[in-house]
Amino acid sequence: MKIAFTVYNLAFVSNWIERLMPYWENCEIVIFHIANLQGQKEPAIEGVKSYDVSSRSYSEIIDIIEHERIDLWINFNFRSLFELFFQRICALQNIKSVYLEHGFFSQNTLHFKTQKAQKNIWETVNRQLNFWKKYIGVLYHAKKRLQEWRILQQVYFKNNFKYSPFDYYFIFSQREYSLLSNVFPLDESNTSLIGYPIFSSEKDKKEATSAGLKMNGEVLYVHQPFILDGYATISYEEEKKYFLDLEKQLLKKYKRLIVLLHPRENLSTYIKRFADTQIDIIQSPNNYSCFTDKSLIIGHYSTALLYALYFEKPTIILNYPSVKNDPIFQECFPTVEDMENICTIDFQIDINKKIPFAGKENTYEHIA
């Protein structure tokens, strides 16, 4: 079987594709990405065929797809014109399409990141023009042009995603099923609840469970790229002050603060920025061991907080300067409005939310 992936950001390669590959037998992997358009370095992955379609036309992309003879196409997202472009090609070329959930559904999922677009206006304009040039090919070459135009209007401009459904949906949990049922026509025949992947394999899962959990006195802060994505109006230096103020409060009770940096942020830049502090900056996507020995987890609405929920770690939702928290995890974790109260609150979590939110199985092996 030949499986293709739409890769908007190369972080999906290391965070998902490379984690799934060991469990696929007799499968060829092809990725279609826009590294050049995104200013990223093109990946070189053993066993994976890679196509940068940044500067390729609709006709050139179709030629590649027909040459590769794709059996199954996987999308991690469904909101951008880039992803809709490949989804419509699948529908027109009779290629089975799959939506593989990579992050929790939130109030931001169905909306464009307008703050980020305004912050990087010319990059955004260039990227959107690139997508539109490609998509015009879909409209022009389709046998039912009027129908394709109506689908574009409904999906892209009106958020009516049911006009362009996937063939299959792999989503984390019952919570996600309930929400995404309002977006896509989900039912038992086309949807699988796969569980959020905490572990690589069943073996890792058993080893972690048998090892037990520890409390080492350290605090793990799960970072979100609020500044990078344009959600926050503060500067990186102001963010540094925010972390230093947080550390000052935490040291009244805990040993040290560790910041788990978001995968899309630049690790070396952050390490240099915090070189004159005692705050540790790490970047270790999909590594459950970052959570198992911590005494407290702090976050906002990152999907990575599912690790904390899975391991039943004391966890709080903390306000971030100039950003309104998404209410995703308010059902699971307490919210602290003022960081001065961070060491005085009893951090009780609702473990009954574990399966409804994180699902079952929870391995890449199971998803594959």
Where are the regions that the model predicts?
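Short loop/turn segments at strand-loop or loop-helix junctions that form parts
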Residues: 7-8, 32-36, 100-105, 195-197, ...
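Conserved catalytic-core segment of nucleotide-activated headgroup transferases in glycan assembly
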Residues: 16, 196-269
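Donor nucleotide-activated moiety binding/catalytic core segment of transferases
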Residues: 53-65, 260-311
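Active-site proximal beta-strand in glycosyltransferases
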Residues: 91-115, 119-139, 220-222, 316-318
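A nucleotide-sugar donor-handling region in carbohydrate enzymes
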Residues: 130-228
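Catalytic binding pocket for nucleotide-activated donors in carbohydrate/polymer assembly enzymes
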Residues: 303-361
